[in-house]
């Protein structure tokens, strides 16, 4: 997980310059494993979104943040867009209690999730031939 405090200004989905350095490190790791597919998930706290910028609510903000990260990984760092997905979880998958300031901060995050290779998974489920 990467804290959204590092990646974005409050209520924004524009990635900060400092965050681009962190994403560069992530990109280096992912480039060295070209077979890996991954999803970038945006998460928010439960405070209702009150900004503008074409953002409707926290769910929308989380999707736009994930998409911003994916676009930077593609355009700035050359990662294969066919290996990436962007998703927003909004406030609906918190790590911590939203009743505290610390909990809200923990819940505002972006997560990079390595996706399983489903063909390999299904091969594991197939019965092995015995000789």
Where on the chain are the PLM-derived regions?
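Extended, gly/pro-poor, charged amphipathic helical "stalk/hinge" elements that serve as dimerization
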Residues: 1, 5-7
């Amino acid at each position: 997980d990467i804290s959204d405090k590092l990646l974005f200004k409050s209520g924004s989905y524009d990635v900060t310059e400092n965050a681009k350095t962190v994403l560069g490190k992530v990109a280096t790791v992912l480039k060295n494993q070209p077979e890996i597919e991954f999803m970038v998930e945006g998460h928010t706290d439960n405070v209702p979104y009150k900004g503008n910028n074409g953002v409707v609510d926290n769910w929308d903000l989380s999707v736009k943040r994930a998409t911003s990260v994916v676009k930077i990984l593609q355009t700035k760092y050359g990662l294969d867009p066919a290996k990436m997905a962007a998703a927003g979880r909004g406030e609906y998958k918190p790590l911590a209690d939203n009743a505290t300031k610390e909990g809200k901060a923990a819940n505002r995050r972006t997560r990079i999730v390595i996706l399983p290779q489903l063909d390999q998974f299904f091969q594991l489920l197939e019965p092995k031939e015995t000789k």
